[in-house]
Amino acid sequence: MRDMEGEKPMDHDVSRALIETVVRRTLTEMRADPERSIRILVDMALAVSKGRFQQRFFGIAQRMLEDESSPYYRLAHDTISYVDIDKLLRFGMNLGYNSCTEGAQMIRTLKMEKDIGVPWTQRITLPEPFDDERQERLSRLIGKGESLGIYTWMIFSEDRPVDALHVIGDHLDSAFFLFCNSGGLSRECLERLSELDNVMCVLRFDDEAEAGTAKLRKKGILYSVYLPYSTGDIDQILSGAWFEEAEALSPVFTCLLAEKGCSEKAIKKAAAFAQTALDEQRYRTLPVEFSSVIEEVGWIISGDPEQADLKNIKG
């Protein structure tokens, strides 16, 4: 696979070090003046953005933050109040720089030079039992993905999220979204999560979510929530009721996740509603529809709808 590999984004990267220094200082200042610090951070990010995705994302963010009453300021203030600076910095740099900047460039290069459609992220559901052999296999798969430019991972381990944490800890240059149930947040899991800076916990939004997010806040762990939905739930989604309930827990993202069998029509409606709600800044959380965001970012990064499964890329 050596001929397909690029230099890893973190190798002797002066640009990353300089950006990280500025971001750390701005995050520290954000606790005193979140509105001004966020605007500075977004303006700086837009100024140094090289790729299409970053320029589009930060351009939109810049326009949104012109509204001084934006609920996203309150979201940022709340997040910075409980999450450790190192966690925000590591996760943000892994996602924004390693994945969407340098990793995206590696993916585009592979597409242009070798016509290989590498996905920008991978969704992985952990099997049970997740023994040592399977952990090693997953770690090798992630290492392979990183060599191709994949530095964002969606890990689903609903009942035993602790099983994923050893592998996550072995890949500190990647950003991991760990989808799980509140019931899976054992004492061991919470302690290990608190030690890792490259993971965002994404809790299922259900009757236990309030207690689950309270545990995460107490440990200073970055979190979002997800809401599984089916075709029959579309009216409730379009009413905005789910997002109104979710924002009370102050999640960074509130993610709609279509269940198996959900119709394409329902998914498109959910995605359109989430995008409109995001653009209009309706809630103190960032509403997204999972599959549509994955697809849109992939399009922006590589312009390729036919992206190969990582397991099928030879190397």
Where are these regions (language model features)?
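N-terminal [4Fe-4S]-dependent radical SAM core
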Residues: G51-I124
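A short acidic (Asp/Glu
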Residues: A164-V167, C189-L190, I267
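Structural recognition of alpha->loop->beta junctions
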Residues: H171-A175, L190-L203, K219, G240-L256, ...
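Short acidic, glycine/proline-enriched helix-loop-strand junctions
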Residues: D163-N181, A272-R284
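Accessory C-terminal segments flanking Radical SAM cores
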Residues: R2-R39, D43-Q55, G59-R63, A266-G315
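Generic structural signal for hydrophobic
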Residues: L141-G145, I168, L193, L216, ...
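Conserved C-terminal portion of the radical SAM core fold
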Residues: L126, T152-F156, E210-W299
